[in-house]
Amino acid sequence: MGSSLSLCYPSDKTFNINGVKYTVNRILGEGGFSFVYLVKDNSNSKKYALKVMICQTQESINTAKREINAFQTFNHENIMKLIDHSISNHSQDTKEYRLLLPYYKDGTLQDLIDNQRTIYGKDTKKPLFKEKKCLQFFLKVCEAIQVFHNHSPPLAHRDIKPGNIVLQNLRRPSNNNNNNNNNNNNNNNNNNNNNNNNNNNNNNNNNNNNNNNNNNNNNNNSEDSDIEAIPILMDFGSVREARIKIENRKDALSLQDEVEQNTTPFYRAPELFDIPSDCQIDERIDVWALGCLLYTMAYNNSPFEVCDNEPNGSVALKVLSGLPKPFPPSQTNYSNQFNQLIIDMVNLDKDERLHLNQVIERINQIIQS
């Protein structure tokens, strides 16, 4: 705890990264052993996000190295770029990793969802996107993840969630009365790569026993429910080789500990909750998380969120019980194809779960239909 407190620098703190000086404006977010600051280049006042990681253990050093390596390995329009980085000795036994990243003023997808719930109520049935826009946005996220899965060896992101997707060029329709003051200027979470959005006060599990969403009014074809933005994937400290063979209890417990520290329960695949001593884990853990993400984009909550007063372990019980049905009501009549895509991604049986290339193919088919 002490090291984290010492990392919370004042607003006039100056960092030197490879000879360039940056001054802290404010903190954007924090999580684990890192803080993210809004900084400006002293030479031209350009704004950036600076992620500072204080590493006191070999494990945290390895996490920082993995994140830097992922930034340097992948080049895709929907994957965040690393502008610069430096490493310094914070103290005798502690290294400080500094990652200079683009600053996205529109915040994260989670900010957008939270804003929607703030305006319309936490149980709102008003979606952020109509179906086509939702799938177009989601397709770009899938294509970014596909870069990881196509790597040799295949890699898994392992922490796909709305808080790890920042928004570029966010556009809200001009006739939306609510697009000003609440317009994601809670960007305090901008590049808060590893912020634990698992507690995102979203704690309403919308699995009402209402009829399928298709029995709702389709009055939301109105323009005010449609937004546009470019998703940018971030937070690569959780990236690991996707295909892991678990051969004994020691392997299982080691992986269990790792995923509990580096993944978000609401988006965690069922095979990662109670890992058997003889099993194979692969990149379809990301497909599960993506299915939960698509559900959240459509229905404003992860399908597996729990309330504050629910006991520990409730998330695991919900996940292991499978996707709640029927789907909650919505002001948008999402098609049966759309909902079936979610069902096929959030499949308890990983061997029956879609692969990402199949997901992308299905998305394109639905968009074109």
Curated annotation (Swiss-Prot):
Q: Which PROSITE patterns match?
A: PROTEIN_KINASE_ATP, PROTEIN_KINASE_DOM, PROTEIN_KINASE_ST
Organism superkingdom = Eukaryota
* Biased composition regions of type Low complexity, renumbered to the chain: 175-221
Q: Does the keyword Transferase apply?
A: yes
Q: Which UniProt keywords apply?
A: ATP-binding, Kinase, Nucleotide-binding, Serine/threonine-protein kinase, Transferase
Record EC number = 2.7.11.1
Annotated catalytic residues: 159 (proton acceptor)
Where is the stretch described as Disordered?
A: 169-225
Q: Which is a Gene Ontology cellular component entry for this protein? A: Golgi apparatus
Which reactions fall under this protein's catalytic activity? Answer: L-seryl-[protein] + ATP = O-phospho-L-seryl-[protein] + ADP + H(+); L-threonyl-[protein] + ATP = O-phospho-L-threonyl-[protein] + ADP + H(+)
- The reply to whether Nucleotide-binding figures as a keyword in the UniProt entry is yes
Signal peptide, first to last residue: none
Q: What is a single Pfam family found in this protein's UniProt entry?
A: Pkinase
For molecular function, the Gene Ontology terms on record are: ATP binding; protein serine kinase activity; protein serine/threonine kinase activity
In which residues is ATP bound? Answer: 28-36, 51
Domain named Protein kinase: which ranges? Answer: 22-367
Question: Which family, according to the similarity comment?
Answer: Belongs to the protein kinase superfamily. Ser/Thr protein kinase family.
Q: What is this protein called?
A: Probable serine/threonine-protein kinase DDB_G0291350
